[in-house]
Curated annotation (Swiss-Prot):
Family: Belongs to the short-chain dehydrogenases/reductases (SDR) family.
Induction, per UniProt: Accumulates upon Pseudomonas syringae infection and after treatment with systemic acquired resistance (SAR)-inducing chemicals, 1,2-benzisothiazol-3(2H)-one1,1-dioxide (BIT) and benzo-(1,2,3)thiadiazole-7-carbothioic acid S-methyl ester (BTH).
Keyword check for Oxidoreductase: yes
Official protein name in the record: Short-chain dehydrogenase reductase 3a
Protein EC: 1.1.1.-
Binding site for substrate: 144
Keyword entries, A-Z: Hypersensitive response, Oxidoreductase, Plant defense
Length: 257
């Protein structure tokens, strides 16, 4: 029996040029998948594709807020590989924390456009491709501990992740009849490009995560989140749908709200 959990599978990973997405590209290809890296960061995305091998990964530049570009990214994948088995909708943005009294509605709209509308567009077009080919696919969205509770994240980010979790549950209900599973993976504070500009910021985020987290002795890394996404993408979770898999060391379960 093969130990490759995505052997022969075709996957799209949005936000795949860095952070959790880049780790997922490496992990998914290690497990036998062919991956299309979707991101607007062309140089970084191409570098990730080269690092895993152009025979295993391709890069497609896309603004997730533009539905036509999203549709074309899915079309590119199906034309290149013949099908689509997995969507890991991971692209996201986060605004700077601040007082709700000073809420910047332009930033709010941008955050919702990327984190919710972008995910909705990819789920829509990926699901269409899966249904057309008769593929019992898996869709995984990066949510957050902020999709379940308020407080840990900035206001627009928290609102967007709550909405994204609702989208996951709604899509689960709407796509189950086609054999398509839809789940979320919900990390606690993990240092990625979304919140860390340099090594000093990475250190600060990891120190915050270690100090405020429940599970001690482990520092949450992007790789841990990618491993959870791999489980949800693979047939190991064949009867799991509509769930929001927490990768938070117990934070959302026991942390006082």
């Amino acid at each position: 029996m093969s130990g490759l959990r995505l052997d022969g599978k075709i996957a799209i990973i949005t936000g795949g040029a860095s952070g959790i997405g880049a780790e997922a590209v490496r992990l998914f290809t290690d497990h036998g998948a062919k991956v299309v890296i979707v991101d607007f960061q062309e140089e970084l995305g191409q570098n990730v594709a080269v690092s895993v091998g152009k025979d295993k990964a391709s890069f497609y530049r896309c603004d997730v807020t533009n539905e036509k570009e999203v549709e074309n990214a899915v079309k590119f994948t199906v034309e290149k590989y013949g099908k689509l088995d997995v969507l890991f909708s991971n692209a996201g943005v986060m605004e700077q924390p601040g007082s709700f009294l000073d809420l910047n509605l332009e930033q709010f709209d941008r955050t919702m456009a990327v984190n919710v509308r972008g995910a909705a567009a990819f789920i829509k077009h990926a699901a269409r491709a899966m249904v057309e080919k008769g593929t019992r696919g898996s869709i995984v969205c990066t949510t957050s501990v902020a999709s379940e509770i308020g407080g840990p994240g900035p206001h627009a980010y928290t609102a967007s992740k709550h909405a994204l979790l609702g989208l996951v549950k709604s899509a689960c209900g709407g796509l189950g009849k086609y054999g398509i599973r839809v789940n979320g993976v919900a990390p606690y504070a993990v240092a990625t490009a979304i919140n860390s500009r340099d090594e000093e910021t990475v250190r600060m985020v990891e120190e915050y995560s270690a100090a405020t987290g429940i599970l001690k002795g482990v520092v949450l890394k992007a790789r841990h989140v990618a491993e959870a996404a791999l489980f949800l993408a693979s047939d190991d979770s064949a009867y799991v749908s509509g769930q929001n898999l927490a990768v938070d060391g117990g934070y959302s379960v026991v942390k006082p709200i």
